[in-house]
Amino acid sequence: MKEWFKMFKRKIYNEIKKWKEESNGRTALLIEGARRVGKSTIVESFAKNEYATYILIDFSVVGNDIKILFDDMSNLNYFFTSLQLYFRVELKERNSVIIFDEVQLCPKARQAIKSLVKDGRYDYIETGSLISIKKNVKDILIPSEEQKIQMNPMDYEEFLWALGDFSTMNLLRTVFESRKRLGDDLNRKMMQQFRLYMLVGGMPQAVYEYIQTNNFKKVDEVKRNIISLYEDDFRKIDSTGRLAMIFEAIPSQLNKKAKGFQTKKVIKSYKVKEDVILSLISELKDSKVVNIAYHCNNPDVGLSASKDLDLYKLYMADTGLFVTMQFKDKDFTDNIIYEKLLSDKLSANLGYLYENAVAQAIVSSGNQLFYYTFTNDKIKKNYEIDFILSKKNKICPIEVKSSNYRKHISIDKFYEKFSNRILKRYIIHTKDISKDKDIQCIPIYLSSLVCEE
């Protein structure tokens, strides 16, 4: 485990602890997530703290002498003895955990979970990226004894924790619940702090680099390396390069403000079949590197019921990586660009950057992404609701504004159509807390609290 990651408190730790207490050996835990989000680190930290002993099998480095053990699981006593001798660790019944790290690299280990869980002597935690990609599961039986949770990049609160700030979000929760204004000066300070989070992002390695160096150029280098890693993965999955092309087009496609991601334009092929496109998007989704917002054709409580698989938008799972992707036209992004972004003085329309940050907050809170578009045929005007949340037996439309807004026509027209379905309306913007009739206007640094409310 990388020692420098120990400082980072992650919310998923409590989810893993809940699994351990409630499962009591009846299921294995599978932690999915994009590469470099910190899966291995948090799992090893959990194993050290919550068990007497543990064995970590990193399938990206172990040799065939370990992998071949999974070819025959008929003699578990031999299997466990071999592991203990190899790793020089004594396993304690019901007080040890075996970790399968990067389990997608050894599909038979994942398949073995069924017999291992049934045996019941130890707990099992699997971590993986690209774990649902077709080539990683085509030759095995997926065990039903797995409980899955997803690990995302660090959210804003986790980012503040990494900076040593354990009070701000608790105080902001109180402010949010009371709907009291902070005042312009304090709001500006909070916005600058949130923009710092957007620029650095939530990838642990990038956060660490910022803490150590306070140098945006070095942070950008870390993020570029992560992006290159993802692009290499996509080229391995899809040798035609189309998957990498779709990934690289995310910032430009969001900037176009189109009704949905124009996949055929991006891959420069209008003849490609719809099932091929669906397969590509599915692979991209399974990578956990992007967040997909699907168009909801009938915005009501069961948003998934009217999800349009052919109409969607793509967001980066990490807004910090999104920033680097946006300025990837040079070998590096100058500190001056980061400094102007931080002070909100860059002469560019970056509304989609804030939109990506809100999408990330929604996903981190455990929600799926949905949006809605509609047309006024009389005046030939298109309207769009950026995001829709389902709460209780109602829905909550959300519009994201990157600057001081004066109008909110889309959310008003949406209310005219679906007022009986709406619980609350939100505008997420860069200004202080306010209310416009029944519309809740919330600063973007409180966007995660909108999801929790």
Where on the chain are the PLM-derived regions?
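A cross-kingdom feature that marks ATP-driven nucleic-acid transaction machinery
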Residues: K2-K6, K11, K20-E21, T27, ...
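Conserved lysine of the Walker
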Residues: K39
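Structural recognition of the conserved hydrophobic beta-strand(s) that form the central parallel beta-sheet
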Residues: I99, D123-S129, Q150
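Hydrophobic anchor at the beta1->P-loop junction of P-loop NTPases
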Residues: I31
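Interdomain hinge/linker elements that couple catalytic modules in large macromolecular machines
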Residues: E3-W4, G164-I337, L341-Y354
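Short glycine-rich substrate-engagement loop in P-loop NTPases that contacts/grips substrate
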Residues: V61-R94
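Short regulatory helix/loop adjacent to the ATP-binding pocket of P-loop NTPases
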Residues: S115, S132-K148, L160-D165
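Conserved P-loop NTPase "ATPase switch" module shared by AAA+ and STAND
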Residues: L91-K108
